Amino acid sequence: MTHLTASKPIGCWHQGESSPEPLDAAVENALLNVGRPIYVVDRQGGFAVSQTGTAELGRRSTGDDGTLPLHAYAPPLHPEALGDPVFKRTHGLQYAYVAGEMANGITSVRMVMEAGRAGMVGFFGAGGLMPTEVEEAVDRLQRAEPRIPFGVNLIHSPGNPELEMALAEMFLGKEVRLVSASAFVEPTLPLAYYRLKGIRRDADGRVVCPNRLVGKVSRSEVARKFLSPPSARHVGRLVDSGLLSREEAALATTVPLVEDLTAEADSGGHTDNRPAITLLPTMIALRDELAAAHGYAKPPCVGLGGGIATPQAAAAAFAMGAGYVLTGSINQCCVEAGTSEAVCSMLAEAGQADVTMAPAADMFELGVKVQVLKRGTMFPQRAAKLHELYTTYGSYDQIPAKQREALERDIFRCTFDEEWEQTRRFFIAREPKQVERAEKDPKHKMALVFRSYLGRSSTWATGGEPTRKIDYQIWCGPAMGAFNQWAKGSPLEKPENRRTVAVAMNLLFGAAVATRATWLRSQGIPLPGAAGSIRPMELADIRKRLGESPTPSI
């Protein structure tokens, strides 16, 4: 029996259909019954737990009225209750949970559909795909029955603003109402166009903005621009070009550029490796500052992504004020992910230290890096070598002969001219301007060839190309290792058992359990060490637990 500590009674408890049980024996099961209240009472000089009966806060138990002193109370906490209700209402969700976009269709149509059917939302990973491929994915998602909430990613293309605008126009034409903007260092014209097109006042005079843009940022200076109204410069250009009406432009100052903002901490892919514990409070404070300054009728919700891989991480995010949580790396190892079994197996063996930063294909010349898996692949080292050569030499011919031989033998597996011809065909189809420039600028030609290796390394991975396994580029953050450690010995240990909804519900259910354990501890109740820390469960077992939800009395 756990004996009373300095905890003082907060009220009295009237016994229900069952007697309280000793805390050490009953509290872990009680915490799992998240749909039922937990009462911790003084019974014969020790703490005991019940999930029935009624409580009266502030009333002292006299001992002769059939009551027991109440020392702590934890209300029911269904996973549906986690997060910001405004976020869930705005997007038509049951849970404040987002399956974040991973490029090249890794966050696949199938994954987005599964998330939507479960009351969550997923963003299709459109980055790196042709507009026709993105349009096909949108068509499939819009044909889903029943209709589901879904979003699509718009990734920053600093060297190809025409692609950004083409995608924005396609989203508007297809009436895609939810778009995630990622890897942006500042707002661009296509983002403002997507956000503001169709803005109007309803019959009651309220501003209606049909297109919801969710920004994903790591830096406060970028967040400030996303949380502010679209810039007057962009609005003016859109009006002058006839893309916005003057009526739409007049309402531009009434809304922030983004409907919601994801604070992106130490994530896979594009990341600034920010610590979540400092990033999220900063972003929330910035939101509050700008919402007050601009008088928004509906301030943006701020969520957290990057490192969300265990129930404790999700619980911590919600406790810090996250309106929602966003997952990425851990979804890549789910059966619905648009990647290969080989990648899933590699990810399932990763530890938290098995990641590193490597040059990014889409922003190679700028020196931008992405976080990738380093275990089982030589991509990080080879990509770093290519960037070193690019910054050192003015053309491929200037690279010493022995190094060129090594590149053509180990990385290209063909001559430079053959590699260039393949690269040229790729860019002719996507960005002809790049080819024109490369034929005049040998350094740019070298950059495009090096970028070609970086770009194809990710498609080799998603396609499971066996002859290129040593070159796989697998976007991954330390969250993957944390998830693997948590899942060890559970139904989710093997990648073939990892399904998007099962992973999500384990995180949310576990977060609810962990949160209630924290509530009890904060009231002075000394819980057993493992209380509140659960292992992954079968989805059916979670649903069974969630079915136990009588209405409490207090």
Regions found by a protein language model. Give the residues of each.
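Short secondary-structure transition/capping segments
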Residues: 171-179, 196-206, 231, 343-355, ...
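Glycine-rich phosphate/diphosphate-binding loops and the adjacent beta-loop-alpha structural elements
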Residues: 424-471
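Active-site entrance/lid segments in N-terminal catalytic domains of soluble metabolic enzymes
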Residues: 2-299, 312, 329-331, 458-554
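Helix-termini ("caps") and immediately adjacent flexible loops/tails
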Residues: 286, 336-341, 347-359, 367-394, ...
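Catalytic or ion-translocation cores adjacent to nucleophile or general acid/base/metal-coordination motifs
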Residues: 131-135, 266, 312-371
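Glycine-rich beta-strand-to-loop/alpha-helix junction loops that act as flexible
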Residues: 301-309, 327
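Phosphate/diphosphate-binding loops
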Residues: 160, 167, 171-182, 353-374
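C-terminal catalytic or substrate-handling cores of phosphate/nucleotide-
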Residues: 374-443
